[in-house]
């Protein structure tokens, strides 16, 4: 814990809120980095970026007392504006966050748009390798324009509520060098323009892809989308903030009817992807589904946030993303099994069994103790909220899993 203690002594904190966020977030990230073998330089570099680029934009520190009034993020069931995750197959820690401004939810900033550019500038000033070319092109198409924002505010055409944010960032903590992604949630843009969310994003991707380098996989997704099982709704997208020639574009969807048949439909694009690799991955996905024992059923997509300090009050839909890269004729699926609301002890047992079957002996041995060290205040024999979702993909003959975690 030395980097945390050292930085806590020498860094100035402008207010008690940022210090509270630091005391909650930094130890968890540091313990996870140390468990994954990050060297000391990387630990300091990544915590320094959190301090400089993230803490100023996390808004109120969540408490039971302010839970009813604070701005709640779209990221997590509890409305927490930052969500850590761990790519356990590669040992890479990540976090996604929604920048929140000081005037959010007021007449000065009803749509939480005022700090987008400030936060982005902080990121690019911190790391000049961040390339905003594609991000800017999608932002101009998927965020509210100034005219739309003013019109909505003046006419009351749409009531903005917490959890209906439009943008966010994710940071892959790769050693001492982060890789940043930009996220666009288009539900508000859809409500304002009357254009369905899927069409908004598909049209934007086609417009930005001026050379048609991902037309073929995009056509396959668009053909599938109108015929998908389980009431699939495309709802947000992301783009890597790197050289556009190498950047991945991802489209995300929620599937209301949770079942393995629904996951199979997402994974194979309704039978449109039928490669040996895809089928091999499907077998392992089935194994993970059987181990987690997520109850099948129809889930609500639009739900109220859970209350801090209270256990989960619902189960959630399945989530999926498809990656689009030049040179790939098929969208590359990644599905998210969402056991949020099930006992964390059961989820951990299921994952450890999956690791053991893969021969990941060290991971199987250390997973539970590492997880407990990240959240020392949680009783994992009782909790049902920490391990929110498990993402699964399959590439080059290997499964890749990430665990998404709730800080509160």
From Swiss-Prot:
Keyword Acetylation carried by entry: no
Keywords: Prenyltransferase, Transferase
Pathway recorded for this protein: Secondary metabolite biosynthesis; Alkaloid biosynthesis
Any Pfam family the entry gives: Trp_DMAT
UniProt-listed Enzyme Commission number(s): 2.5.1.-
Keyword Oxidoreductase: no
Gene Ontology annotations of biological process type: alkaloid metabolic process
A GO term for molecular function: prenyltransferase activity
Catalyzed reactions per annotation: preechinulin + dimethylallyl diphosphate = tardioxopiperazine B + diphosphate; preechinulin + dimethylallyl diphosphate = tardioxopiperazine A + diphosphate; tardioxopiperazine A + dimethylallyl diphosphate = echinulin + diphosphate; tardioxopiperazine A + dimethylallyl diphosphate = variecolorin L + diphosphate
Domain of life: Eukaryota
Positions that bind dimethylallyl diphosphate: 94, 181, 183, 248, 250, 252, 334, 336, 400, 404
Family, similarity comment: Belongs to the tryptophan dimethylallyltransferase family.
Quaternary data: Homodimer.
Job description of the protein: Prenyltransferase; part of the gene cluster that mediates the biosynthesis of echinulin family alkaloid. The pathway begins with the biosynthesis of the cyclic dipeptide cyclo-L-Trp-L-Ala (cyclo-TA) by the NRPS criC via condensation of L-alanine and L-tryptophan. The prenyltransferase criA then catalyzes the first prenylation step, a reverse prenylation reaction at C2, to yield preechinulin. Preechinulin is the substrate of the cytochrome P450 monooxygenase criE that catalyzes the formation of the double bond between C10 and C11 to produce neoechulin A.
PANTHER family: INDOLE PRENYLTRANSFERASE TDIB-RELATED, PRENYLTRANSFERASE ASQH2-RELATED
Identification of the protein by name: Prenyltransferase criF
Organism: Aspergillus cristatus (Chinese Fuzhuan brick tea-fermentation fungus)
Name of the gene encoding the protein in the UniProt record: criF
